[in-house]
Amino acid sequence: MPSNGIVRSWRRAMATMNVSLPDAMREWVEGQTQSGRYHNASEYVRDLIRRDQERADKIAHLQRLIDEGLDSGVGERSLHEIRAEARRRAGVDHEL
C-alpha cells in the first residue's frame, strides 16, 4: 500500500516467526480472524506491521517538514499578513 510516495513490496519470501502472547491478546487475534476480517493470525499481524510502518513513514515525513520549517528561520511577515495569505489560499474573503 503506497504511503507518501513510498511503495513497499510485500510479495517476497516469507519467514516464520513465533510470537508469545498473553491469553487476552491471543483471544483478540483469534477474534479478528473469526470475524472474517482476516483469514488467519499471520495476515492480521502483517496488517498491523504494515500500518505501523506507514505510521512511522508519516511521522518521519512530518518531522522532516518540521525541521525544514525550523531551519528556515524567522519570517519577516506579520501575523496579520500570514492570516491574510491563508484566507486568500483558502478562498475566504473575510476574517473569521
Swiss-Prot record:
Belongs to the ParD antitoxin family. InterPro entries: ParD (IPR022789), ParD_sf (IPR038296), Ribbon_hlx_hlx (IPR010985). Disruption phenotype: Cannot be disrupted, suggesting it is a functional antitoxin. No visible phenotype when the parDE4 operon is deleted. This is Antitoxin ParD4. It holds the Pfam family ParD_antitoxin. Keywords: Toxin-antitoxin system. Signal peptide: none annotated. NCBIfam families: antidote_CC2985. One of its GO terms (biological process) is regulation of DNA-templated transcription. Coiled coil: none annotated. Antitoxin component of a type II toxin-antitoxin (TA) system. Neutralizes the effect of cognate toxin ParE4, but no other RelE or ParE toxin. The gene is parD4. Disulfide bonds: none annotated.
